[in-house]
Amino acid sequence: MRLVHLDLKGAPPKVCYLSEIFPLFRALGANGILIEYEDMFPYEGHLRLLRAKHAYSPSEIKEILHLATLNELEVIPLVQTFGHMEFVLKHEALAHLREVARFPNTLNPHKEESLALVTAMIDQVMELHPGARWFHVGCDEVYYLGEGETSRQWLQQEPNSKAKLCLSHMEAVASHMRARYPTTTPLMWDDMLRDIPEDQLSGSRVPQLVEPVLWDYGADLDLHGKALLVEKYRKSGFSWLWAASAFKGATGVNQSLTPIEHHLRNHLQWLQVAGSVPADTLRGIILTGWQRYDHFSVLCELLPVGIPSLAVCLQALLHGDFAENVKARVENFLGISSLEEMSFRR
Protein backbone atom coordinates (compact mmCIF):
# COMPACT_ATOMS: atom_id res chain seq x y z
CA MET A 1 0.00 0.00 0.00
CA ARG A 2 1.05 3.58 -0.67
CA LEU A 3 -0.64 6.07 1.64
CA VAL A 4 -0.44 9.85 1.52
CA HIS A 5 -0.38 11.49 4.95
CA LEU A 6 -2.67 14.47 5.46
CA ASP A 7 -1.46 16.42 8.49
CA LEU A 8 -4.35 18.63 9.54
CA LYS A 9 -2.64 20.45 12.42
CA GLY A 10 -1.70 23.33 10.16
CA ALA A 11 -3.47 24.98 7.21
CA PRO A 12 -5.98 22.12 6.81
CA PRO A 13 -7.40 21.89 3.26
CA LYS A 14 -11.00 22.68 2.48
CA VAL A 15 -13.09 19.73 1.35
CA CYS A 16 -13.43 21.25 -2.13
CA TYR A 17 -9.63 21.20 -2.46
CA LEU A 18 -9.48 17.56 -1.38
CA SER A 19 -12.02 16.77 -4.10
CA GLU A 20 -9.49 18.11 -6.61
CA ILE A 21 -6.33 16.43 -5.31
CA PHE A 22 -7.70 12.98 -4.38
CA PRO A 23 -7.98 12.03 -8.09
CA LEU A 24 -4.39 13.20 -8.53
CA PHE A 25 -3.23 11.10 -5.56
CA ARG A 26 -4.82 8.06 -7.16
CA ALA A 27 -3.48 8.80 -10.64
CA LEU A 28 0.04 9.17 -9.24
CA GLY A 29 -0.07 5.78 -7.56
CA ALA A 30 -1.52 6.24 -4.07
CA ASN A 31 -4.16 3.81 -2.85
CA GLY A 32 -4.75 5.19 0.62
CA ILE A 33 -4.57 8.24 2.88
CA LEU A 34 -3.57 8.60 6.50
CA ILE A 35 -5.59 11.43 8.03
CA GLU A 36 -4.05 12.98 11.14
CA TYR A 37 -7.03 14.93 12.43
CA GLU A 38 -5.56 16.62 15.51
CA ASP A 39 -7.99 19.44 16.42
CA MET A 40 -9.83 19.31 13.08
CA PHE A 41 -12.06 16.43 14.14
CA PRO A 42 -15.58 17.40 15.34
CA TYR A 43 -15.27 16.03 18.86
CA GLU A 44 -18.49 16.17 20.87
CA GLY A 45 -19.62 16.11 24.50
CA HIS A 46 -16.86 16.41 27.09
CA LEU A 47 -14.29 16.36 24.26
CA ARG A 48 -15.77 19.34 22.43
CA LEU A 49 -13.07 21.65 23.80
CA LEU A 50 -10.50 19.77 21.66
CA ARG A 51 -11.94 20.89 18.34
CA ALA A 52 -10.66 23.97 16.54
CA LYS A 53 -13.11 26.73 15.67
CA HIS A 54 -12.76 25.79 12.00
CA ALA A 55 -12.90 22.01 12.55
CA TYR A 56 -14.59 19.85 9.94
CA SER A 57 -18.23 19.04 10.61
CA PRO A 58 -19.43 15.41 10.75
CA SER A 59 -20.97 15.87 7.31
CA GLU A 60 -17.65 17.14 5.95
CA ILE A 61 -15.85 14.11 7.40
CA LYS A 62 -18.38 11.87 5.65
CA GLU A 63 -17.84 13.80 2.41
CA ILE A 64 -14.06 13.34 2.70
CA LEU A 65 -14.55 9.60 3.20
CA HIS A 66 -16.93 9.50 0.23
CA LEU A 67 -14.40 11.30 -1.96
CA ALA A 68 -11.73 8.84 -0.85
CA THR A 69 -13.97 5.91 -1.76
CA LEU A 70 -14.72 7.40 -5.19
CA ASN A 71 -10.97 7.57 -5.82
CA GLU A 72 -10.23 4.10 -4.39
CA LEU A 73 -8.21 5.55 -1.50
CA GLU A 74 -8.39 3.59 1.74
CA VAL A 75 -8.62 5.87 4.77
CA ILE A 76 -6.66 5.29 7.97
CA PRO A 77 -7.42 7.78 10.75
CA LEU A 78 -4.68 8.89 13.16
CA VAL A 79 -5.22 10.02 16.75
CA GLN A 80 -2.30 10.74 19.05
CA THR A 81 -2.61 8.84 22.34
CA PHE A 82 0.69 9.36 24.22
CA GLY A 83 3.13 11.94 22.84
CA HIS A 84 2.30 15.04 20.75
CA MET A 85 -0.76 15.61 22.91
CA GLU A 86 -0.32 19.40 22.86
CA PHE A 87 -3.69 20.05 21.26
CA VAL A 88 -5.32 18.17 24.14
CA LEU A 89 -3.17 18.95 27.16
CA LYS A 90 -2.90 22.68 26.41
CA HIS A 91 -6.42 23.04 27.81
CA GLU A 92 -6.57 24.00 31.48
CA ALA A 93 -9.31 21.44 32.11
CA LEU A 94 -6.96 18.63 31.02
CA ALA A 95 -3.59 20.00 32.15
CA HIS A 96 -3.63 17.73 35.23
CA LEU A 97 -3.10 14.78 32.86
CA ARG A 98 0.33 15.99 31.74
CA GLU A 99 3.32 13.80 32.58
CA VAL A 100 5.27 16.98 33.41
CA ALA A 101 3.20 19.96 34.51
CA ARG A 102 5.14 22.50 32.42
CA PHE A 103 4.90 20.63 29.12
CA PRO A 104 1.73 19.57 27.24
CA ASN A 105 3.48 17.07 24.95
CA THR A 106 3.20 13.90 27.02
CA LEU A 107 0.24 12.18 28.66
CA ASN A 108 0.63 10.83 32.20
CA PRO A 109 0.30 7.05 31.73
CA HIS A 110 -0.31 6.38 35.42
CA LYS A 111 -3.72 8.06 35.63
CA GLU A 112 -6.84 6.08 34.73
CA GLU A 113 -8.35 9.30 33.42
CA SER A 114 -5.58 9.47 30.79
CA LEU A 115 -6.57 6.15 29.26
CA ALA A 116 -10.25 7.08 29.48
CA LEU A 117 -9.50 10.31 27.61
CA VAL A 118 -7.66 8.76 24.67
CA THR A 119 -10.06 5.83 24.32
CA ALA A 120 -12.96 8.30 24.23
CA MET A 121 -11.16 10.17 21.44
CA ILE A 122 -10.61 6.92 19.56
CA ASP A 123 -14.25 5.93 19.96
CA GLN A 124 -15.57 9.22 18.58
CA VAL A 125 -13.27 9.01 15.55
CA MET A 126 -14.13 5.36 14.95
CA GLU A 127 -17.82 6.22 15.03
CA LEU A 128 -17.29 8.18 11.80
CA HIS A 129 -14.88 5.55 10.38
CA PRO A 130 -16.79 2.31 11.04
CA GLY A 131 -15.13 0.36 8.24
CA ALA A 132 -11.52 1.30 8.99
CA ARG A 133 -9.20 -1.71 8.67
CA TRP A 134 -6.37 0.14 10.40
CA PHE A 135 -6.27 2.94 12.98
CA HIS A 136 -3.06 4.82 13.79
CA VAL A 137 -2.61 5.59 17.50
CA GLY A 138 0.53 7.72 17.13
CA CYS A 139 2.77 7.15 20.19
CA ASP A 140 5.83 8.88 18.73
CA GLU A 141 8.22 11.29 20.44
CA VAL A 142 6.96 10.82 23.99
CA TYR A 143 9.59 13.30 25.09
CA TYR A 144 8.98 13.52 28.83
CA LEU A 145 8.13 9.91 29.57
CA GLY A 146 9.29 8.96 33.06
CA GLU A 147 10.03 12.54 34.14
CA GLY A 148 6.83 13.18 36.10
CA GLU A 149 6.88 12.80 39.88
CA THR A 150 4.63 9.72 39.82
CA SER A 151 6.84 8.12 37.19
CA ARG A 152 10.02 8.92 39.14
CA GLN A 153 8.65 7.14 42.19
CA TRP A 154 7.41 4.22 40.10
CA LEU A 155 10.78 3.85 38.37
CA GLN A 156 12.55 3.51 41.73
CA GLN A 157 10.80 0.18 42.24
CA GLU A 158 12.36 -2.96 40.75
CA PRO A 159 11.98 -4.17 38.01
CA ASN A 160 10.25 -1.08 36.63
CA SER A 161 11.76 0.77 33.66
CA LYS A 162 10.86 3.42 31.10
CA ALA A 163 10.46 0.64 28.54
CA LYS A 164 7.96 -1.16 30.75
CA LEU A 165 6.07 2.09 31.36
CA CYS A 166 5.96 2.84 27.65
CA LEU A 167 4.84 -0.65 26.66
CA SER A 168 2.15 -0.79 29.34
CA HIS A 169 0.42 2.34 28.03
CA MET A 170 0.76 1.22 24.42
CA GLU A 171 -0.70 -2.15 25.38
CA ALA A 172 -3.63 -0.53 27.19
CA VAL A 173 -4.52 1.66 24.20
CA ALA A 174 -4.09 -1.13 21.66
CA SER A 175 -6.05 -3.59 23.83
CA HIS A 176 -8.99 -1.19 23.85
CA MET A 177 -8.83 -0.99 20.06
CA ARG A 178 -8.67 -4.76 19.60
CA ALA A 179 -11.46 -5.47 22.09
CA ARG A 180 -13.82 -2.76 20.88
CA TYR A 181 -13.02 -2.99 17.16
CA PRO A 182 -11.81 -6.54 16.44
CA THR A 183 -11.58 -6.00 12.66
CA THR A 184 -9.40 -2.88 13.04
CA THR A 185 -5.64 -3.18 13.54
CA PRO A 186 -3.77 -0.42 15.42
CA LEU A 187 -0.72 1.13 13.78
CA MET A 188 1.98 2.88 15.83
CA TRP A 189 5.07 4.97 15.06
CA ASP A 190 8.11 2.89 15.98
CA ASP A 191 10.60 5.37 17.47
CA MET A 192 9.69 4.62 21.10
CA LEU A 193 10.13 0.89 20.39
CA ARG A 194 13.54 1.04 18.69
CA ASP A 195 15.72 0.98 21.79
CA ILE A 196 13.61 -1.49 23.77
CA PRO A 197 15.42 -4.85 23.98
CA GLU A 198 13.97 -7.70 21.95
CA ASP A 199 13.16 -9.78 25.04
CA GLN A 200 11.14 -6.93 26.57
CA LEU A 201 9.21 -6.41 23.35
CA SER A 202 8.43 -10.10 22.97
CA GLY A 203 7.55 -10.32 26.66
CA SER A 204 4.79 -7.74 26.22
CA ARG A 205 1.54 -8.10 24.29
CA VAL A 206 2.34 -5.15 22.02
CA PRO A 207 3.69 -7.27 19.11
CA GLN A 208 0.41 -9.22 19.02
CA LEU A 209 -1.68 -6.04 19.12
CA VAL A 210 -0.11 -3.51 16.75
CA GLU A 211 1.75 -3.09 13.48
CA PRO A 212 4.69 -0.67 13.90
CA VAL A 213 5.50 2.02 11.35
CA LEU A 214 9.25 2.48 10.87
CA TRP A 215 9.85 6.12 10.01
CA ASP A 216 12.94 7.80 8.66
CA TYR A 217 12.88 10.94 6.52
CA GLY A 218 16.58 11.29 5.75
CA ALA A 219 18.23 11.25 2.33
CA ASP A 220 20.84 8.72 3.44
CA LEU A 221 19.30 5.88 5.42
CA ASP A 222 21.35 3.38 7.37
CA LEU A 223 20.27 0.47 5.18
CA HIS A 224 22.02 -2.19 7.25
CA GLY A 225 20.62 -0.71 10.45
CA LYS A 226 17.12 -0.75 8.99
CA ALA A 227 17.47 -4.41 8.04
CA LEU A 228 18.62 -5.24 11.58
CA LEU A 229 15.70 -3.28 13.05
CA VAL A 230 13.23 -5.12 10.83
CA GLU A 231 14.76 -8.43 11.91
CA LYS A 232 14.50 -7.43 15.58
CA TYR A 233 10.83 -6.52 15.23
CA ARG A 234 10.04 -9.76 13.43
CA LYS A 235 11.83 -11.81 16.09
CA SER A 236 9.92 -9.88 18.76
CA GLY A 237 6.64 -11.13 17.33
CA PHE A 238 5.36 -8.34 15.07
CA SER A 239 3.68 -10.03 12.12
CA TRP A 240 3.60 -7.03 9.77
CA LEU A 241 5.56 -3.77 9.57
CA TRP A 242 5.07 -0.51 7.67
CA ALA A 243 7.56 2.07 6.42
CA ALA A 244 7.18 5.85 6.55
CA SER A 245 8.99 8.30 4.29
CA ALA A 246 8.42 12.02 3.78
CA PHE A 247 7.47 14.02 0.70
CA LYS A 248 7.56 17.34 2.56
CA GLY A 249 7.80 18.86 6.01
CA ALA A 250 10.94 17.05 7.14
CA THR A 251 13.87 19.30 6.22
CA GLY A 252 13.35 22.31 8.46
CA VAL A 253 10.83 23.64 10.93
CA ASN A 254 10.25 26.78 8.82
CA GLN A 255 10.99 25.33 5.38
CA SER A 256 8.88 27.09 2.76
CA LEU A 257 9.89 25.40 -0.51
CA THR A 258 10.24 21.63 -0.79
CA PRO A 259 13.70 20.24 -1.70
CA ILE A 260 12.50 17.57 -4.11
CA GLU A 261 15.90 15.90 -4.51
CA HIS A 262 16.11 15.18 -0.78
CA HIS A 263 12.70 13.55 -0.69
CA LEU A 264 13.30 11.55 -3.86
CA ARG A 265 16.50 10.13 -2.35
CA ASN A 266 14.59 9.25 0.80
CA HIS A 267 12.12 7.18 -1.21
CA LEU A 268 14.76 5.51 -3.35
CA GLN A 269 16.52 4.50 -0.13
CA TRP A 270 13.30 3.03 1.26
CA LEU A 271 12.95 1.01 -1.95
CA GLN A 272 16.37 -0.47 -1.19
CA VAL A 273 15.25 -1.35 2.34
CA ALA A 274 12.10 -3.00 1.00
CA GLY A 275 14.18 -5.03 -1.43
CA SER A 276 16.49 -6.26 1.31
CA VAL A 277 13.85 -7.74 3.65
CA PRO A 278 11.52 -10.74 3.18
CA ALA A 279 8.56 -10.07 0.89
CA ASP A 280 5.99 -10.71 3.63
CA THR A 281 7.47 -8.09 5.97
CA LEU A 282 6.32 -4.62 4.87
CA ARG A 283 2.60 -4.12 4.38
CA GLY A 284 2.97 -0.64 2.90
CA ILE A 285 4.56 2.78 3.07
CA ILE A 286 3.17 6.06 4.41
CA LEU A 287 4.41 9.16 2.59
CA THR A 288 4.28 11.74 5.38
CA GLY A 289 3.72 15.40 4.65
CA TRP A 290 4.09 17.37 7.86
CA GLN A 291 2.46 20.79 8.14
CA ARG A 292 4.04 21.62 11.51
CA TYR A 293 6.62 19.86 13.67
CA ASP A 294 4.18 20.13 16.57
CA HIS A 295 0.97 21.93 17.53
CA PHE A 296 2.76 25.12 18.62
CA SER A 297 5.32 25.27 15.82
CA VAL A 298 5.32 27.53 12.78
CA LEU A 299 4.12 26.15 9.47
CA CYS A 300 6.56 24.45 7.13
CA GLU A 301 5.75 23.83 3.45
CA LEU A 302 2.05 23.90 2.69
CA LEU A 303 0.41 20.97 0.93
CA PRO A 304 0.05 22.65 -2.51
CA VAL A 305 3.77 23.50 -2.47
CA GLY A 306 4.60 19.86 -1.76
CA ILE A 307 2.49 18.35 -4.56
CA PRO A 308 5.35 18.20 -7.13
CA SER A 309 7.51 16.38 -4.57
CA LEU A 310 4.64 14.01 -3.80
CA ALA A 311 4.26 13.29 -7.51
CA VAL A 312 7.96 12.49 -7.86
CA CYS A 313 7.99 10.27 -4.77
CA LEU A 314 4.83 8.32 -5.59
CA GLN A 315 5.95 7.65 -9.14
CA ALA A 316 9.39 6.56 -7.95
CA LEU A 317 7.75 4.06 -5.59
CA LEU A 318 5.35 2.86 -8.27
CA HIS A 319 8.05 2.27 -10.89
CA GLY A 320 10.89 1.29 -8.57
CA ASP A 321 13.20 4.07 -9.78
CA PHE A 322 13.15 7.59 -11.22
CA ALA A 323 14.43 7.09 -14.74
CA GLU A 324 13.93 9.66 -17.51
CA ASN A 325 10.65 8.09 -18.65
CA VAL A 326 9.26 8.31 -15.10
CA LYS A 327 10.40 11.93 -14.84
CA ALA A 328 8.61 12.67 -18.11
CA ARG A 329 5.42 11.09 -16.75
CA VAL A 330 5.56 13.33 -13.68
CA GLU A 331 6.11 16.44 -15.79
CA ASN A 332 3.12 15.42 -17.88
CA PHE A 333 0.95 14.86 -14.78
CA LEU A 334 1.88 18.27 -13.41
CA GLY A 335 1.66 20.09 -16.73
CA ILE A 336 5.16 21.55 -16.47
CA SER A 337 8.03 21.61 -18.96
CA SER A 338 10.81 20.68 -16.53
CA LEU A 339 11.02 19.43 -12.96
CA GLU A 340 14.44 21.03 -12.61
CA GLU A 341 12.75 24.41 -12.35
CA MET A 342 10.89 23.17 -9.27
CA SER A 343 13.85 21.60 -7.44
CA PHE A 344 14.00 24.44 -4.94
CA ARG A 345 16.69 24.64 -2.32
CA ARG A 346 16.27 26.68 0.82
Swiss-Prot record:
Protein purpose: Has hexosaminidase activity. Responsible for the cleavage of the monosaccharides N-acetylglucosamine (GlcNAc) and N-acetylgalactosamine (GalNAc) from cellular substrates. Has a preference for galactosaminide over glucosaminide substrates.
Stated name of the protein: Hexosaminidase D
Protein localization: Cytoplasm; Nucleus; Extracellular vesicle
One Pfam family here: Glyco_hydro_20
EC number of the protein: 3.2.1.52
Main location: cytoplasm
Any one of the GO BP annotations: carbohydrate metabolic process
This protein's UniProt keywords: Cytoplasm, Disulfide bond, Glycosidase, Hydrolase, Nucleus
Keyword Nucleus in record: yes
CDD domains linked: GH20_GcnA-like
Activity regulation (record text): Inhibited by O-(2-acetamido-2-deoxy-D-glucopyranosylidene)amino N-phenylcarbamate (PUGNAc). Inhibited by galacto-NAG-thiazoline.
Residue numbers annotated as active site: E141
Source organism superkingdom: Eukaryota
CC annotations in GO: cytoplasm; extracellular vesicle; nucleus
Class of the enzyme per the UniProt entry, highest EC level: hydrolase
Subunit structure, interactors included: Homodimer; disulfide-linked.
Catalytic activity: Hydrolysis of terminal non-reducing N-acetyl-D-hexosamine residues in N-acetyl-beta-D-hexosaminides
Gene name of the encoded protein: HEXD
A GO MF term: hexosaminidase activity
Protein family (similarity comment): Belongs to the glycosyl hydrolase 20 family.
The species this protein was found in: Bos taurus
